[in-house]
Amino acid sequence: MAWSPLLLTLLAHCTGSWAQSVLTQPPSVSGAPGQRVTISCTGSSSNIGAGYDVHWYQQLPGTAPKLLIYGNSNRPSGVPDRFSGSKSGTSASLAITGLQAEDEADYYCQSYDSSLSG
């Protein structure tokens, strides 16, 4: 049986007039089952580069977002160790090893931004 590549769709959703997108993610990342994929999150000196933590969320179709990684690289209880997070400079990344069909979802990165306070 031939496997079709999985498509991990990354969407930037903003709601409300106050919302501003300050972190950049690729529109999509794809990989075959069993492979390792990395999702990037690029920020600036006012958020990731300022030392603020990065958090990652996974949203499966028809469900609310679920916390996947907190504090750059920590996994909540119940999250498989196939998921890992890292941060360097003004960017962060989420790695998924041993990609599985159930990993097809939307993934979001989040961080505090000092330029938006006030």
Swiss-Prot record:
Region of interest: Framework-1: 20-44
UniProt entry keywords in alphabetical sequence: Adaptive immunity, Cell membrane, Disulfide bond, Immunity, Immunoglobulin, Immunoglobulin domain, Membrane, Pyrrolidone carboxylic acid, Secreted, Signal
Annotated stretches, region: Framework-3: 74-109
Region (Complementarity-determining-1): 45-53
Pfam families attached to this UniProt entry: V-set
Region ranges (Complementarity-determining-2): 71-73
Known function: V region of the variable domain of immunoglobulin light chains that participates in the antigen recognition. Immunoglobulins, also known as antibodies, are membrane-bound or secreted glycoproteins produced by B lymphocytes. In the recognition phase of humoral immunity, the membrane-bound immunoglobulins serve as receptors which, upon binding of a specific antigen, trigger the clonal expansion and differentiation of B lymphocytes into immunoglobulins-secreting plasma cells.
Identification of the protein by name: Immunoglobulin lambda variable 1-40
